[in-house]
UniProtKB/Swiss-Prot annotation:
The gene is sfsA. This is Sugar fermentation stimulation protein homolog. One of its GO terms (molecular function) is DNA binding. Transmembrane segments: none annotated. InterPro entries: SfsA (IPR005224), SfsA_C (IPR040452), SfsA_N (IPR041465). Belongs to the SfsA family. PANTHER family: SUGAR FERMENTATION STIMULATION PROTEIN A (PTHR30545:SF2).
Length: 231
């Protein structure tokens, strides 16, 4: 479980330059917030949408506000892509994810592959498990879809996970669905057909595909249950 910082109600005015978004606060003030999501945020960046932002006055920050959540399709969606790694890390430590139980060590951001860092490296003696975490916010017809924009980086990660399996290790591509209205996860072939091809190839070559739904609220975010990955 991840405890959210105090969240401030706001209304989205616009998102622009990928990492910036303007909001109107309840007192009418207009503020600019950092958008911690490099994807297209399709369906999650509609002007006029209710949102929650956080504030941090740490010295050196260019923007004191960060966009955390948005309300779309009558539900709250977590758009901060820095949170899923922490959610999965905490869930593994708490034995919430039964498929990843029994490991003695969890290390974040470990170098591997070609100039890459694995999100989480699990170990048990000489046994290694490489876990790549992906945040999912796009939904169509009750299915969570990834990615919401073409991702060369995501394609690279799948190739590197396949290489880890070839070397005799365990590798997992882990989807965190930060919205409650999805019953399954699938590749967004219409957006990035190459990612879809590589995801199917990775699954056929031993990379495990896991997906968990996250319960998003103003106070907390936590993983609740596994979702099927439909290829």
């Amino acid at each position: 479980m991840y405890l959210m910082p105090p969240l401030i109600p706001a209304v989205l005015i616009r998102r622009y330059q990928r990492f910036l978004a303007d909001f109107q606060l309840e007192n009418g003030e207009i503020v600019t917030a950092h958008c911690p999501n490099s994807g297209s945020m399709k369906g999650c960046a509609v002007p006029g949408s209710p949102a929650f932002i956080s504030r941090c006055d740490k010295p050196g920050r260019k923007l004191c506000y960060t966009w955390e959540q948005v309300k779309a399709d009558n539900c709250w969606i977590g758009i901060n892509t820095s949170l899923p790694n922490r959610l999965v890390h905490n869930a593994i430590e708490s034995n919430v994810i039964k498929e990843l139980q029994g490991y003695h060590s969890i290390r974040p951001e470990v170098r591997y592959g070609i100039n890459s860092r694995i999100d989480l490296l699990l170990s048990r003696g000489d046994e290694l498990c490489y876990v790549e975490v992906k945040n999912v916010t796009l939904m169509e017809d009750g299915r969570a879809l990834f990615p919401d924009a073409a991702t060369v980086r995501g394609q690279k990660h799948l190739r590197e996970l396949m290489e880890m399996v070839r070397l005799g290790h365990r590798a997992v591509n882990f989807f965190v669905v930060q919205r409650p209205d999805c019953s399954s996860v699938s590749p967004a072939d219409a957006i990035d057909p190459e990612y879809g091809r590589l995801l199917r190839l990775a699954a056929a070559n031993g990379v495990e595909l896991l997906a968990y739904q996250a319960q998003v609220s103003r106070e907390t975010i936590h993983l609740t249950h596994r979702l099927p990955v439909i290829l």
